[in-house]
């Protein structure tokens, strides 16, 4: 079978990190997962930035490109990486919640067939556009934190999506998985045990991997530091990945979405 026929038979997976609450790391995880899978693991990736009008990931790509253009070390890193990989940076497509799926479909129809498309959707799920886009996903991953208000909001979102979309056989959505984010090591005791019990009672799948509360998840490319963590042009640097549980999280995600 020739390669072009195989390309045509490949069905891209549509995946979103999504929850009702802002500030829980949806955009960060989208970028980290996309960059890790594309630059390190060799998967073909596209990102649809639906966070209208901010378009945070498109803004990050612009800042990353400017930083690389202005810094000799980053310029060398980029040249070496893209020469070795033999491909350009993954595309970041600007869209809106209403047009998210159409944007991805159009990109694919034009002959760009990635293995996986990540969608960065806004936190408000009270609009029809966001609900329709979530219904068009294959998998949703929801970061949760032990803050009571955030957790209650995230769980009510997850329960609603699970009931309305995952259990609805007419919808594309095959699964929604929760994972703990911003875990304070000192608190990973009775509080989390109690919350885990509640999540189990709600019959929501909880991932094994948890993400520790560490400042590195907030770091972008900066001129005076060559170690990279959150970037659309590079994967996270090995020294910064250590202890972040990022690799474990993405390995578990790959397992759940059955990425070949």
Regions found by a protein language model. Give the residues of each.
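Walker A (P-loop) phosphate-binding motif
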Residues: 3-39, 43
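P-loop/Walker-type NTP enzyme "switch/lid" segment
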Residues: 18-24, 39-117
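Structural beta-sheet core signal
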Residues: 47, 119, 142, 178-180
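Glycine-rich phosphate-binding loop used to anchor ATP phosphates in small-molecule kinases
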Residues: 112-129
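Conserved C-terminal guanine-recognition region of P-loop GTPase G domains, centered on the G4
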Residues: 154-170
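Beta-strand-loop-alpha "switch" segments that mediate conformational coupling across diverse proteins
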Residues: 182-231
């Amino acid at each position: 079978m020739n390669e072009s026929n195989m390309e045509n038979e490949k069905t891209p997976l549509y995946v979103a990190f999504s929850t009702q609450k802002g500030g829980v790391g949806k955009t960060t995880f989208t970028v980290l997962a996309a960059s890790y899978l594309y630059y390190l693991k060799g998967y073909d990736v596209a990102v649809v930035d639906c966070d209208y009008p901010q378009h945070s990931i498109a803004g990050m790509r612009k800042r990353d490109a400017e930083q690389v253009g202005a810094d000799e070390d980053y310029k060398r890193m980029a040249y070496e990486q893209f020469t070795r990989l033999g491909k350009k940076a993954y595309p970041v497509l600007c869209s809106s919640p209403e047009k998210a799926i159409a944007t991805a479909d159009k990109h694919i129809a034009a002959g760009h067939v990635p293995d996986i498309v990540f969608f960065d959707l806004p936190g408000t799920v009270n609009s029809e556009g966001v609900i329709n886009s979530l219904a068009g996903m294959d998998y949703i991953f929801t970061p949760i934190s032990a803050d009571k208000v955030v957790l209650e909001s995230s769980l009510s979102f997850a329960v609603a999506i699970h009931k309305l979309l995952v259990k609805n056989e007419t919808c594309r959505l095959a699964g929604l998985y929760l994972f703990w984010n911003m875990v304070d090591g000192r608190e990973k005791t009775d509080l989390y045990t109690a919350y885990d019990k509640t999540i189990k009672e709600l019959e929501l799948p909880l991932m094994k991997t948890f993400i520790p509360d560490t400042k590195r998840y907030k770091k972008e490319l900066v001129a005076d530091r060559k170690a990279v963590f959150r970037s659309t042009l590079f994967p996270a640097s090995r020294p910064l990945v250590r202890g972040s549980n990022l690799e474990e999280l993405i390995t578990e995600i790959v397992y759940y979405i059955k990425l070949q």
